[in-house]
Amino acid sequence: VRRMSVFSLSNLKKTWYYLQKNGIRNAVWAVLERIGQEQEVYTWQEPDEKTLSFQREHSASLRISIVVPAYRTKKEHLEAMLNSVSRQSYPHWELIVADAGGTAESVQAWAKKNGICLRKAADASNLAEWKDQSIMLCTLSENKGISANTNAGIELAAGDAVGLLDHDDLLTANALWEMADCLEKEKKRGKQKLVLFSDEDKC
């Protein structure tokens, strides 16, 4: 099935346009690279319960704000993202969903189904209001694009660090713990990391 998808009519057209623009040598390399990628088998690596239990008992104190810009997100994708965040082994997080339209009702329905009280955006003005594992729904007045929508969510963040997550992405259960652990280790070494980017097993 993977090989069939490589040689679809759509891909052949793209290859032809690429060849015209970049020449036959570059086109051949691009095709070979694509075939290699299609044949790769990726295994989703979930941590076992023993690992998660250890992480719950040995967590850093760093507070992480996760900002999710959302716009007309499909319900099933949104719920999967929310579930993946709520199941984190790391306890010190808040989730801020910056909704630019078409997502608020799905967030509210998910929260009601799971017995979660959504936080109000006004609560973020006071850091003392921080509450572990809280979820804030910020309804934006208009859709200004992913960058501006993300910035609107960041402005409400009360954490020590900010993590960016797409509205249809998933986190493995240990993702935030791994990030916080890395930051904590670097801090003890006298270093401060400004940006961290995780591999596919942590995001």
What are these regions (language model features)?
Residues 174-203:
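Conserved donor NDP-sugar-binding/catalytic core segment of glycosyltransferases
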Residues 162:
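Short aromatic/hydrophobic "clamp" motif used to bind/position activated sugar donors
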Residues 140-157:
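Glycine-rich, basic loop-to-helix element that forms the pyrophosphate-binding segment
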Residues 17-84:
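N-proximal low-complexity "stem/linker" segments adjacent to membrane-targeting elements
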Residues 82-92:
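Short, acidic, metal-binding catalytic loop of nucleotide-sugar glycosyltransferases
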Residues 166-170, 199:
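The conserved acidic donor/metal-binding loop of glycosyltransferases
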Residues 91, 99-111, 115-116, 142:
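A conserved acidic beta->alpha catalytic loop
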Residues 85, 99-102, 144, 167:
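Conserved short acidic donor-positioning loop in nucleotide-sugar-dependent glycosyltransferases
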